């Protein structure tokens, strides 16, 4: 039975985002972009399937499912135990866009499920989840970055990782197009939705890549600036 003092320390840690002694700093410091592991593994698996390396694709699939479940569990645990850390990440220009890897990972995993197992129902659920995640994060992240009072300079705040905000909706498009043929009369609305998403993502790419080009061209560039955030 924890003492009153221990409970107070734990409550203060949740409110301030600090890690109390004995707690797992791994969970507290979990980077929002870690879902890139699921995204990357899924891409390699799908590529292997398309070039005829079926054994490689099938081997990577269960591994990727495990990665997804482990990261999802750690993320949920982090939200529950360290909500202040999560909120701080949402308004951090270097870390916030990492949340969009969740969208891309969900969509890529859905494509894996569809192409390797043929389970359209599971792939559809993952597609819907990806859309929900994308909508919530698009409004949540960019609103938080806009209204926060403490902002870095352009040189410090933007990096190549921001392009994952473009990859996220485009991954939804890829899975949506793969699923559209099975929706009968709803296929055309789904394809129209995918077209709109693709065009919107393309416009977002122009905005972001312009800022990245401007930052790399007109500001001092250090080797550390090319490292992951």
Language-model features and meaning:
Residues 15-46, 61, 83-111, 127-130, ...:
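Juxtamembrane helix-loop boundaries in multi-pass membrane proteins
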Residues 139-145:
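Membrane-water interface at the C-terminal end of transmembrane alpha helices
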Residues 1-16:
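Short, intrinsically disordered terminal tails adjacent to the first/last structured region
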Residues 59-73, 122-136, 192-205:
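Structural signature of hydrophobic alpha-helical transmembrane segments
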Residues 47-58, 113-122, 176-192:
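Helix-coil boundary and interhelical linker segments in multi-pass alpha-helical membrane proteins
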